[in-house]
Amino acid sequence: MKRKVALGCVLMLSAMTVLSGCGGGGDSEGGTSEGGKTKIRFASWDVAEDVDRQQAIVDKFNESHDDIEVTLEAYGSDFDTKISAGMGSGDTPDVMYMWNYPAYYEGLEPLDEYIENEGEEYKTNFYDTLWNYNSIDGQIYGVPVGFTTHALFYNKDLFTEAGIEEPTGDWTWDDLQTAAKTISEKTDAKGFAFSMKPDPYDFEMYLWSNGTAYCDEEGNMDGYINSAESEEVFQMFQDMEKDGYAIATEKNGTDEFRAGQVAMYVYGSWSINTLNEDGMNYGVTKIPSFGSQPSVSILSSSGVSMSKDSENKEAAWEFIKFWTNEECNKERIGLELPVLNSVVESEKIMEQAEYAPFYVMLEQSDGYTPASFIMESWSEVSEDLSLAFEEAFNPSTLLDVKEVLESSVQ
């Protein structure tokens, strides 16, 4: 999985504007080919070798279906631009990868009836939490294909060098800070790294873990983003930086972790392949908790959706079913974490130490709704929060946390 569900939702407002003006019209290249096959288009955001792997799966579908022909359209970094333009002109691909449902759902076909017709076993084979991230206002607009939660990565060699025990699943943030201090004192590395300008979508998980959020169910921020629980979270991160055993990085911390400059950081499963290729001696465990409260993670999730304007919806659904079946879920391991219970079991994913924590965090994170799914003005709010967070965490500023959070609700 290459995309994050609401990567700042930077295109939300423009996409909503486009969607508000889109009308009927089908896709311009849909219909029937000369061979009598129903032609459908499938849009992906992947690039390079990932596209090659996707094309191989599309080829398998085409070879096994005499009546449907799928064409893969790899948009890469132009994905959002082309999907928005397609929805505005009525020329959207029949099937597409999807992440930013708040922005695009008006141009998508609700899939509840299709899913219901497949029977209860079809839906329950997916991890239930993932349906929440592929739905808007109780309606499902995408079938899950990939996800990641976040977990704590740690450098085993640095823990050995510092002479301390490795992190465990019952760690609290106090435990992490104690270890980070020791590592900073006994090695040339810092104990922990986090982004000086974290993605607000991601950072809300820390507030959830401490009993609060950015806003309530109506989108009201006052009393939430500036609550005592929220202040405690932000103050903890800032204090770790001030005390010198954590660093605030320009990106997400992966570069510093790979270089052996930091012993721990929290991130999604995206870096696993890279760390394995590096031959790094690392471990993964759950995000630490605040006291006795279970830690919670945000989900970065992707689904496969159908255009509401598709003239070939039955064929599109047939392809969606194929793309989300067990065989294809297995073939995409490495691109995306499996979303089917049956595949996780058959491939013994929970026995793989680097992957299991992401599923444990998935189970612990059910029932939380990101502010991006609640607030209509999330695009603007996200930009404001990002700037505010940078003021609190940038080592050149380190503004007062309470003042920063109060300014976020004004």
List the model feature ranges, each with a label:
Residues M1-R41, E63, E406-Q410:
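Short, low-complexity disordered leader/linker segments with a strong preference
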Residues S302-S377:
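Mature extracytoplasmic/periplasmic domains
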Residues K60-F126, E161-G163, A263-M264, T274, ...:
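Extracytoplasmic "Venus flytrap"/periplasmic binding protein-like
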Residues A180, G219-A248:
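Glycine-centered hinge/linker elements that transmit conformational signals in sensory
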Residues T71, S135, P338-N341, A356-Q410:
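C-terminal capping/gating helix-and-loop segments adjacent to ligand/active sites or protein-protein/ligand interfaces
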Residues Q139-V145, H150, T160, D175-D222, ...:
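Extracytoplasmic/periplasmic solute-binding protein
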Residues M98-T149, N281-T285, M350-E354:
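Hinge/lid segment of periplasmic solute-binding proteins
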Residues A85, D94, E120-L158, P294-V296, ...:
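A structural signal for short loop-to-beta-strand junctions that line the ligand-binding cleft
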